[in-house]
Amino acid sequence: MSVFFVTGTDTSVGKTIVSRAIIQAMQNAGIQIVGYKPLACGQDDPVYTDVQESGQTDYDNMDNRDVLVLQDSTNEEVSYQDINSYTFAHTMPMLSQEGKHIDINKINTDLKRLSSRYQSVLVEGSFGWLTPINQDYTFASWAAEHKMPVVLVVGIKEGCMNHALLTVQSIEQMGLPLLGWVANRINPMLGHYAEIIEDLSKRIKAPLLGKIPYMHKPETQELGHYITDIDRLSYMKTEILK
């Protein structure tokens, strides 16, 4: 059983797109895998216009784009609730009263259930590495508690080198294996794109797992062929806390 954590250098750097690419690549290699988004936050334009709300769930709206992309990417039959513990309408629930209701035990239980059913589980964080989950945990401290290996998504833009190297430093200081990093081109007009990737490859000890070019609606496309080092993502076994 393999469980690994996907984090990013910032918000809107393409964690979900890279997660889709990884899921598709591993499935193409014959590996059973699902994605899991513990905490999904609000967005300006919901995918569904007809949103149903229920007071009997942990969800404001079951229309978060990231969760829906993960659900669409896997070959397994999973529901929205199977792969998401909390969806909030607000952008930063962990900084509001809503954050007090985020129960880490529920997240742990949901992860354990998935890891017992499927060969591999890709866990996608929200925002960046040190973002709070609630008053007691950050995504980093939670991943460290489970000893999850990490994949870093670097959105190639101005300032990404500083963000990437600081995140790598924090991951290493927490004693977690960095499986590798993925370059996601989010600014097609950025100069020195190749030079940035070359320099980061020299400075980050972990391998470059793939490069995803800028494209229209990547969430609807086959992206698996952009991930070129599947072995790094499947060889480590993770023991989920009981």
Curated annotation (Swiss-Prot):
It is an enzyme of class 6 (ligase). Its EC number is 6.3.3.3. GO terms for cellular component: cytosol. One of its GO terms (biological process) is biotin biosynthetic process. Its cofactor is Mg(2+). Keywords: ATP-binding, Biotin biosynthesis, Cytoplasm, Ligase, Magnesium, Metal-binding, Nucleotide-binding. Pathway: Cofactor biosynthesis; biotin biosynthesis; biotin from 7,8-diaminononanoate: step 1/2. The keyword Cytoplasm applies. One of its GO terms (molecular function) is magnesium ion binding. Transmembrane segments: none annotated. It catalyses: (7R,8S)-7,8-diammoniononanoate + CO2 + ATP = (4R,5S)-dethiobiotin + ADP + phosphate + 3 H(+). InterPro entries: DTB_synth_BioD, P-loop_NTPase. Its main location: cytoplasm. The active site is at 37. Mg(2+) binds at residues 16, 66, 124. ATP binds at residues 12-17, 66, 184-185. It is found in: Cytoplasm. Gene3D superfamilies: P-loop containing nucleotide triphosphate hydrolases. Belongs to the dethiobiotin synthetase family. Catalyzes a mechanistically unusual reaction, the ATP-dependent insertion of CO2 between the N7 and N8 nitrogen atoms of 7,8-diaminopelargonic acid (DAPA, also called 7,8-diammoniononanoate) to form a ureido ring. Homodimer. This is ATP-dependent dethiobiotin synthetase BioD. It comes from Mannheimia succiniciproducens (strain KCTC 0769BP / MBEL55E).
